[in-house]
């Protein structure tokens, strides 16, 4: 009623266990009048809380926001006792000054200066859903949910979990991005300090789903890197990683030569030193033939005569060149379950370009994929992908990078795009895939779900798909990001952090698994990290399910 009297609404969320209600009035603190209204509403809220003998803070601290209302809530006499206790234990006022006693007015250090215009820098991504890139960074409310340990679980934020460094939290990155974009200089994107802080972001996208405000640091990092690259020419290694699909395509006709140089101890060490890859890391090798060539040769024989459905298979660059076994397993699994597969001459997923901030090049690939795949994909023929980081770009970055003309088609395509595990779990739920199609033999499966898969789709489809065989016991490793994060863990300056992230939960769980336990990971870089970090071979879910398929 009080908020309504001022014409205001509020966002509410609560903790059942502590009986606490969070109230976030929708107030524009950039407006001088609204900023004054903040104090008025806070004062009236404090009086309401006092009236009903409640607490202003619940299980939270009072701090600078609520400290000035403590005398009202507990009474002047009790407040004087608090001040006496504070003086006894902290006579010089050096321990958290101004947080509970002698707190300054709650509106004396507001983040925004009322009346100061919000910058509107041009961007490559479409940030219109939150009012522009500056407001995307401003979404952070400082709650600190990103400051959690691996013991608590979840995905956000792996670099903080491994280091405990506040600078590497989602909160710190969002706020320093905000300050950078408000900076009064010709090019606010030209900041080495921002580059170094964002450099240790693994782009797991955990903040996209776990941050209460939905701050997407991976998206902000990608945008920043394009502007930074415009001023500071990227290194040879950065260009190589971004152009990896082209390099793979070039060597796909002579994979033996590529693999010799990649696996020979002497030549591999030279490559790593020249490019800046970690000496401890093994270089991914090329498959003897591409998945696309294999499909052209074998698909007609695999496709069922009387299919129960049809899918358009997205041939991503990682499956195409590196993970032929996973691709073959996916094709045999889907056709064995009764689905007809089609595939088109799609471009690469643009994942390497997006990760390294080459957004102009990424847009070209995105445009081609939309134009090529759009006419083929529908409710009756969904787009299904094998590598999570590649296929999920259709649902995440593609609509925001497609441009005004293609955005509607990109959004439509996103609605019909699924990971392999999502598709299989959905078809099982619909009754078109049945348990009887799979073995009754028992098996234990330990699975690490790809970080972007967890952030965008959740782990549930992976666990559901792997659990279709009736006697398969599936357990998810309670890990966040594996630590490899695409090319991140290959880079020499990031190797140690990648290992620390892996050692938080993933590596110990894999090492403790019995020799007969099936280790599973949908992500190509996750599987590589598990192999390098533990010596165990992790399989793609398609390989696990194909081995369980009857007939």
List each model region and its residues.
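Conserved alpha/beta core surface patches that mediate binding of polyanionic ligands
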Residues: 1-14, 37-46, 50-51, 138-141, ...
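Core alpha/beta catalytic barrel or barrel-like domain that forms the active/cofactor pocket
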Residues: 8-24, 49-67, 92-105, 341-348, ...
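Helical (often loop-to-helix) elements that flank the catalytic cores of nucleotide-handling enzymes
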Residues: 30-49, 74-85
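Ferredoxin-type iron-sulfur electron-transfer modules and their immediate structural context
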Residues: 51-56, 63-200, 219-233, 238, ...
């Amino acid at each position: 009623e009080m908020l309504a009297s001022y014409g205001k609404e509020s966002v509410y969320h609560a903790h059942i266990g502590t009986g606490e209600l969070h109230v976030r009035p929708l107030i524009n603190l950039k407006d001088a009048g609204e900023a004054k209204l903040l104090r008025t509403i806070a004062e009236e809220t404090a009086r309401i809380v006092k009236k009903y003998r409640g607490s202003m803070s619940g299980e939270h601290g009072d701090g600078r926001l609520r400290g000035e209302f403590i005398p009202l809530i507990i009474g002047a006499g009790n407040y004087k006792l608090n001040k006496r206790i504070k003086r006894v234990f902290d006579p010089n006022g050096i321990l958290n000054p101004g947080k509970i006693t002698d707190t300054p007015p709650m509106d004396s250090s507001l983040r925004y200066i009322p009346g100061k215009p919000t910058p509107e820098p041009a961007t490559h991504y479409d940030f219109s859903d939150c009012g522009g890139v500056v407001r995307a960074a401003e979404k952070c409310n400082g709650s600190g949910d990103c400051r959690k340990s691996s013991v608590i679980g979840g995905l956000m934020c792996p670099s903080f979990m491994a280091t405990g460094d506040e600078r590497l939290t989602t909160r710190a990155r969002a706020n320093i991005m905000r300050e950078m974009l408000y900076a009064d200089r010709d090019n606010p994107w030209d900041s080495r300090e921002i580059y170094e802080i964002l450099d240790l972001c693994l782009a797991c996208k955990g903040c996209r789903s776990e941050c209460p405000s939905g701050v997407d640091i991976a998206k902000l990092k990608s945008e920043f890197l394009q502007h930074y690259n415009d001023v500071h020419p990227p290194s040879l290694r950065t260009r190589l990683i971004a152009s990896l699909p082209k390099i793979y395509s070039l060597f796909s006709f002579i994979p033996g030569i590529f693999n010799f140089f990649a696996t020979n101890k002497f030549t591999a060490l030279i490559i790593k030193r020249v490019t800046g890859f970690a000496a401890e890391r093994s270089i991914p090798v090329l498959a003897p033939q591409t998945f696309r060539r294999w499909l052209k040769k074998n698909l007609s024989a695999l496709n069922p005569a009387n299919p129960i459905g049809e899918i358009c298979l997205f041939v991503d660059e990682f499956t195409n060149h590196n993970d032929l076994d996973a691709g073959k397993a996916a094709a045999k699994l889907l056709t064995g379950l009764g689905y007809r597969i089609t595939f088109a001459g799609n471009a690469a997923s643009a994942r390497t370009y997006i990760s390294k901030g080459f957004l102009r090049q990424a847009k070209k690939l995105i445009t081609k994929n939309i134009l090529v795949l759009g006419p083929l994909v529908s409710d009756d023929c969904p787009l299904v992908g094998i590598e999570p980081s590649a296929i999920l770009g259709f649902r995440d970055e593609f609509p925001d990078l497609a441009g005004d003309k293609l955005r509607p088609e990109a959004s439509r395509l996103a609605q019909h795009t699924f990971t392999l595990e999502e598709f299989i779990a959905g078809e099982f739920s619909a009754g078109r895939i049945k348990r009887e199609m799979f073995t009754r033999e028992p098996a234990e499966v330990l699975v690490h779900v790809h970080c972007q898969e967890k952030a965008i789709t959740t782990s549930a489809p992976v666990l559901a798909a792997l659990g279709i065989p009736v006697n398969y016991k599936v357990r998810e490793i309670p890990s966040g990001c594996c630590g490899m994060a695409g090319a991140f863990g290959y880079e020499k300056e990031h190797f140690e952090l990648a290992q620390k992230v892996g050692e938080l939960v993933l590596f110990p769980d894999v090492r403790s698994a019995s020799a007969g336990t099936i280790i599973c990971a949908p992500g190509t870089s996750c599987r590589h990290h598990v192999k390098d970090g533990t010596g165990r071979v992790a399989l793609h879910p398609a390989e696990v399910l194909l081995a369980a398929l009857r007939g």
